[in-house]
Amino acid sequence: MMLGFLLSRAGVDVVILEKHADFLRDFRGDTIHPSTLEIMHEVGLLEEFLRRPHQELPRIALQIGGHRLTVADFSHLPTRCKFIAFMPQWDFLNFLAEAGSRSPSFHLRMKAEVTGLRWKNGSVAGIQASTPAGPLEVAADLVVGADGRSSTVRALAALKVIDLGAPMDALWMRISRRPDDPGQSLGRIGAGRILVLIDRGDYWQVAYVIPK
């Protein structure tokens, strides 16, 4: 979505396909870092973005045993926003979609699922998709697959994946947040255990890290 916004802002005709009817996927990336916020400033979106509901994290703290340790402090960064912003991914994507829609070269098609690639002289030259209105074909000089770890576009293009593996995984859950809960402690580390907490306003988004 961000790439589509930036390209359309530069005058490039862009078509973005989203297979779902909305962006409501829980437990996705909700962190918007100071470097990204700086880009938002550079393209004129920062003030509008900061008016949207979000949480700000100026530092990252860990609870290790009985000790609280600050492991990152963003107050010294040479950026306008010296914090990580937390905003549900669906809200951020909707925000970018609204910003992009102001450009006549930005086209977002919801409920459009990629089913194939168009080929020309051995190169990808567009996509084929299914929509409620019927099949859709889009000719394109550039096709970008931003459809996740199980990318349909990547599979259709027969691109190989180098799996580096990971020694751990995370169990995600949500826990109600009480008014008297402590401040933005982002993680707790014990003997062989790691718990990550993300403040989502009225609840905690929690990741319990487990070995694979």
Task: Enumerate the predicted regions with their spans.
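Active-site-adjacent segment of FAD-dependent monooxygenases/related oxidoreductases
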Residues: H33-A99, R118-N121
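Conserved dinucleotide-binding and phosphotransfer motif residues
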Residues: L3, S8-A10, R102-P104
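Conserved FAD-binding catalytic core of PHBH/FMO-like flavoproteins
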Residues: V124-A125, S130-L136, L142-K212
